[in-house]
């Protein structure tokens, strides 16, 4: 019989610590940034603390705050979180302190929706919203984009950005990064994917400018590069900078474009490319062009990792522990991001550890939980939970006091 990993004292790669610049993650598991649409005029609430805190307790190494807007006009909905003003800093410190207290690293994604801004909530149909339904601090809720091209039929026409608009937003990203540092975040991710503003500049169909920000690939990458440079200048040298890109979008942006962009961003101080896809084309044909299957975006992370010589994060229908471990072992990516699977099971890291032959420890399960799980495991009734192998703390079973 072969010895287990536990007996060999060899940790799976998924649970090996990983250092980027001056920040060490306890494992390679990342909560992907996901919009929850629970903010009020950009400000967070207890919802965000409880929502994000449970993933830190559940064992993730890096917990990302959702897409947070650098400019009020860039909100996808009126319920987006914001970081365009100093008033947002102090409430966010409660989240970052809690995440750190439970052994995870807090990260935040900074974004602007461009022509995809000003919509109703997803469960309200995501239809164009009236300009009057704006977050506090802007009047009117103006749509801006690289070119005066609407996101889709029936959506309002955005105003083409001027050179002054571009400079203003490049600066806004840098200022938001400085606020993120003040709020206690240790990782920043620039959102350059899913059809939002930076992606709009990259895509030749959304960007039909004739100045230095449009036309050939070099020009279309200029805005992304300037944003990355601005953020890196405002962000501490010892803290990692991520960039999320749609590796392909089925609407004019291809994998070799992403490789070129990743190479450029690496020179701007970006450390990790978060590899997703899509977000620009909105027609039903999208699904047939890019059929979904487990790990369907992983090959893009692998290609960018090796061709651009930069660390990558894989995301998209990664749900099994063995699947995640294989991605890392085969050199396809450096980090594993989970979104909806973590919503389904915030304790996914604990489950994954056991499935990969590790005994979950106090570093993964809070003592407040582990004590009771140990007790149930050793009670002799056979009710062993799937997420815990007990016995580390309690050597003998004792009668329960009921409290």
Feature map (PLM): residue ranges:
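Flavin-dependent oxidoreductase catalytic cores
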Residues: 2-403
